[in-house]
Curated annotation (Swiss-Prot):
The gene is mdoD. Belongs to the OpgD/OpgG family. Residues 1-32 form the signal peptide. NCBIfam families: TAT_signal_seq (TIGR01409). This is Glucans biosynthesis protein D. GO terms for biological process: beta-glucan biosynthetic process. Its main location: periplasm. It comes from Salmonella typhi.
Length: 551
C-alpha cells in the first residue's frame, strides 16, 4: 500500500489539467474584481459554465500525468519546499477593505507537480481573470531555488491554496487545498488533522487506485467583513471529470463546507467514493500492538460514527490491523457519517509535537437523497504516525458506467464534536486486554489457565442512570467465539457504565471476529450500537507466558 505514502510524504498523484478547455469556454469582457495579482485575460464565469466544461472534457481523452518541472523545483527536499513562503503582500484579497479572509497559494515543486490554475472572480459581473505564476509572488528564503530557471514560466501555475482568517490573516491558516483533490480544515485549535478528498476511485479493488486532481480553482471575491466565501473547482482524472462548488464558512469554533458536485464518467468505474476522508490510527486504548512509545495513544481519529437512514447510531472504533481490512456498512439514504476524534484529553496522548488531543473531527451530512450504498472503511497496517492508514467514503450501490452523470450535495463539519449526536447513551471509550480472571485480580497469583480477551466499553449520557434501577441488559452478538463474564459496572469518575466481557475462542480460526453490542432496558434500546472487529492470535499464541525470574 505504498500509494498511501503520498499523503503524508507530500507526493501528489498525477491527473490531467487540460488548459485547452478553460480559456476557450469564455468570452472576454470587463473585469472589476478586487485583486492586484490577477493578470490574465478577462473571461466570463459561472457554475453552469463550469459544469458544461467538465461534461465536455469527459468526452475527450485524459491528458495524462503532469509534465516535468524545472530541476530546481523537482529536486526539492521536503525541508526546502516548506521554506518557500507565499508573500502575504500579494495575497488574493489584499485590496479588500475590512477583509476577514484571505488566500495565499502554494508553490509547485517536489512531489506537487500538477500545475493548478487559479482565477479571481468578480461576484457582481461574473467576470474572471487568471492569476499567473511569477517568482515575485513568493519568498524563497533558504530553499536553494534557482529563480533564473523560473523566469518567464507563467504557465507553472500553483500547487494549491490556503485560507487565512482574521485576526491571523498572514500567520495561521484555517483551510488548505493541496495535492490531488485533498483538502482539510481546522477548528478553533488551529491544529490540522485528517484530510478530505474531492473523490476516491478504486480504493479497494484488484486494480490501481486512482487519485483525481483539482486542476483549476475560481474564487469569488470575498465581501468586506464576510467570513464565508465560495470557490469552484474543476476535477479531472482518467475515469471521471467533475465540477465542484464549495461554500466555505470559517466560523469561530469550526469550519463548515457546503459541497455540490456534478460528476461525468469517462469510463466504467468499479468503486466510486463520495465524500472520502483519510486519517491515521496507529494505536489507542483498544489497540496497543505497535505503541511501544512514550505516547499512550497516537491517532488523528479514534472512531467511525454513523447515523444510519433508519435512525440507528453506530460507533465503530478504529484499528491498526496486521492485515489490510475493508468493511462496507450497507445503508439507504444515510443521515450522516464521519471520522471523529472525541478524546480531547492531553494526558491520554502526551504529545507536544503532534497535539493529537487538538485534532478536529470530520462529519459528513448528506443534503440530498443518496439512495442505497455503503459507508466503506479501509484500515491499512502501519508502523507509526507518518502514514495515513484509514480511508472512509460513501460508495453508491449502482455501478458507474461510462457516460453516466451523477450529482451529490453534502455538508462537511470540521469541529471538535459533530453537530449532532445520539440522544441515547453513547460510547465514550473501548479498551481491551488480558481476560480470564475476576476483575480486581489482575491476573491473580498466576496467569489464568484458559486464554481469553477482555473488552470494556464505556457508555455515557442518555437515560442510563434512570434505566439502571429497571435493569440494563447488554445485547452482544459475535460472528464467532463466546462472550462470558459479562459485567455491568457503574464508574463514578465519568458518571457512566462500563460493560465488560471476556471473549473465548471456539475454534482455531484467526479470521476477524465481528462484534456488536447495544444496551437495552425493558425491551427498548437505550444506547447507540457499538461495532468492533477483533483479530484473534494464532492458536499457538493463545497462552500466557510467565517470564518472571524468581531466583
Amino acid at each position: 500500500m505504498n500509494r498511501r505514502r503520498f499523503i503524508k510524504g507530500s507526493m501528489a498523484m498525477a491527473a490531467v489539467c487540460g488548459s485547452s478547455g478553460i480559456a476557450s469556454l469564455f468570452s472576454q469582457a470587463a473585469f472589476a474584481a478586487e485583486s492586484d495579482i490577477a493578470d490574465g485575460k478577462i473571461v466570463r464565469f459561472d457554475f453552469a459554465g463550469l459544469q458544461s466544461m467538465a461534461q465536455a472534457l469527459a468526452k475527450k481523452p485524459w491528458g495524462g500525468a503532469p509534465g516535468p518541472l524545472p530541476d530546481t523545483l523537482a529536486n526539492l527536499t521536503p525541508q526546502a519546499y516548506n521554506s518557500i513562503q507565499y508573500d502575504a503582500a500579494h495575497s488574493l484579497w489584499n485590496g479588500v477593505a475590512n477583509r476577514q479572509l484571505d488566500i495565499q497559494f502554494f508553490h509547485v515543486g517536489m512531489g506537487f507537480r500538477r500545475r493548478v490554475r487559479m482565477f479571481s472572480v468578480d461576484t457582481t459581473t461574473h467576470l474572471a481573470r487568471e492569476i499567473h505564476f511569477r517568482p515575485e509572488l513568493f519568498k524563497y528564503n533558504d530553499a536553494g531555488v534557482d529563480t533564473t530557471q523560473l523566469e518567464g514560466q507563467s504557465d507553472l501555475g500553483f500547487a494549491g491554496f490556503r485560507v487565512f482568517k482574521a485576526p491571523e490573516l498572514a500567520r495561521r491558516d484555517v483551510v488548505s487545498f493541496l495535492g490531488a483533490s485533498y483538502f482539510r480544515a481546522v477548528d478553533d485549535t488551529y491544529q490540522y488533522g485528517l484530510s478530505a478528498r474531492g473523490l476516491a476511485i478504486d480504493t479497494y479493488t484488484d486494480g490501481q487506485e486512482e487519485f483525481p486532481d483539482f486542476t483549476a480553482f475560481w474564487f469569488d471575491t470575498a465581501k468586506p467583513g464576510d467570513t464565508t466565501f465560495t470557490v469552484y473547482a474543476l476535477l479531472d482524472s482518467a475515469s471521471v471529470t467533475g465540477a465542484y462548488k464549495f461554500v466555505i464558512h470559517c466560523e469561530k469554533t469550526q469550519v463548515i463546507m457546503d459541497v455540490e458536485n456534478h460528476l461525468y464518467a469517462r469510463k466504467d468505474i468499479k468503486q466510486l467514493g463520495i465524500a472520502p476522508m483519510t486519517s491515521m490510527f496507529s494505536c489507542g486504548n483498544n489497540e496497543r500492538r505497535v505503541c511501544d512509545t512514550i505516547h499512550p495513544q497516537i491517532h488523528d481519529s479514534d472512531r467511525l460514527a454513523m447515523w444510519r437512514g433508519n435512525g440507528e447510531w453506530i460507533c465503530r472504533p478504529l484499528n491498526n490491523p496486521q492485515k489490510l481490512q475493508f468493511n462496507a456498512y450497507m445503508d439507504d439514504n444515510p443521515k450522516g457519517f464521519g471520522l471523529l476524534q472525541l478524546d480531547r484529553d492531553f494526558s491520554h496522548y502526551q504529545d507536544v509535537m503532534g497535539w493529537y488531543n487538538k485534532r478536529p473531527s470530520l462529519w459528513v451530512e448528506p443534503r440530498s437523497k443518496w439512495g442505497k450504498g455503503a459507508v466503506s472503511l479501509m484500515e491499512i497496517p502501519t508502523t507509526g504516525e507518518t502514514l495515513d492508514n484509514v480511508v472512509c467514503f460513501w460508495q453508491p450501490e449502482k455501478a458507474i458506467k461510462a457516460g453516466d452523470t451523477l450529482a451529490f450535495n453534502y455538508r462537511l463539519y470540521w469541529s471538535a464534536q459533530p453537530p449532532v449526536q445520539s440522544p441515547l447513551a453513547r460510547v465514550m471509550a473501548t479498551r481491551t486486554g488480558m481476560g480470564g480472571f475476576p476483575e480486581g485480580w489482575a491476573p491473580g497469583e498466576h496467569y489464568p489457565d484458559k486464554w481469553a480477551r477482555r473488552f470494556a466499553i464505556d457508555f455515557v449520557g442518555g437515560d442510563l442512570k434512570a434505566a439502571a434501577p429497571k435493569g440494563i441488559e447488554p445485547v452482544i452478538t459475535l460472528s464467532s467465539g463466546e462472550a462470558k463474564q459479562v459485567e455491568i459496572l457503574y464508574v463514578e469518575p465519568f458518571d457512566g457504565y462500563r460493560i465488560q466481557f471476556d471473549w473465548y475462542p471456539t475454534s482455531d480460526s484467526t479470521a476477524p471476529v465481528d462484534m456488536r453490542m447495544f444496551l437495552r432496558c425493558q425491551g427498548e434500546a437505550i444506547s447507540e450500537t457499538w461495532l468492533y472487529q477483533y483479530f484473534p492470535p494464532a492458536p499457538d499464541k493463545r497462552r500466557y507466558v510467565d517470564d518472571r525470574i524468581m531466583r
